[in-house]
Amino acid sequence: MQLNITGNNVEITEALREFVTAKFAKLEQYFDRINQVYVVLKVEKVTHTSDATLHVNGGEIHASAEGQDMYAAIDGLIDKLARQLTKHKDKLKQH
């Protein structure tokens, strides 16, 4: 899995990069054929937003989440992506 992290109005520190990498590594337990991941972290006034696009076998998955801090936004994003990956895996098994 290739992971690309970009920040808009936020500096991507080493701690933040490690946190994102660890969280996205856990997504492989839901679907093991994740090819590329694009993560965009944004800060707009008081809103912290995280967006991600996953290129997986059989399609593309996108999710976005907001939080009071960047770590909460990333946690919300991972929860949404885990649900979507589970649904995607079930769809592929049905065919």
From Swiss-Prot:
Keywords: Translation regulation
Highest taxon in the source lineage: Bacteria
A Gene Ontology BP annotation from the UniProt entry: negative regulation of translational elongation
Phenotype of gene-disrupted mutants: Non-essential gene, no formation of inactive 100S ribosomes. Double hpf-yfiA deletion mutants form 90S ribosomes. A quadruple yfiA-hpf-rmf-sra knockout strain is significantly outcompeted by wild-type after 4 days growth. No change in sensitivity to aminoglycoside antiobiotic gentamicin in stationary phase cultures.
Signal peptide region: none
GO cellular component terms, semicolon-separated: cytosol; cytosolic small ribosomal subunit
Record GO terms (molecular function): ribosomal small subunit binding; ribosome binding
Induction conditions: Induced during stationary growth phase (at protein level). Induced by the signal autoinducer AI-2.
Role, per record: During stationary phase, promotes and stabilizes dimerization of 70S ribosomes by the ribosome modulation factor (RMF), leading to the formation of inactive 100S ribosomes. Converts immature 90S particles formed by RMF into 100S ribosomes. Crystallization with T.thermophilus 70S ribosomes shows it binds in the channel between the head and body of the 30S subunit, where mRNA, tRNAs, initiation factors IF1 and IF3 and elongation factor G would bind; however RMF is still able to bind.
Subunit description: Associates exclusively with 100S ribosomes, which are dimers of 70S ribosomes.
Record-linked NCBIfam families: PRK10470.1, yfiA
Family affiliation: Belongs to the HPF/YfiA ribosome-associated protein family. Short HPF subfamily.
The protein's name in its UniProt record: Ribosome hibernation promoting factor
Species per Swiss-Prot/TrEMBL record: Escherichia coli (strain K12)
Gene name as annotated: hpf
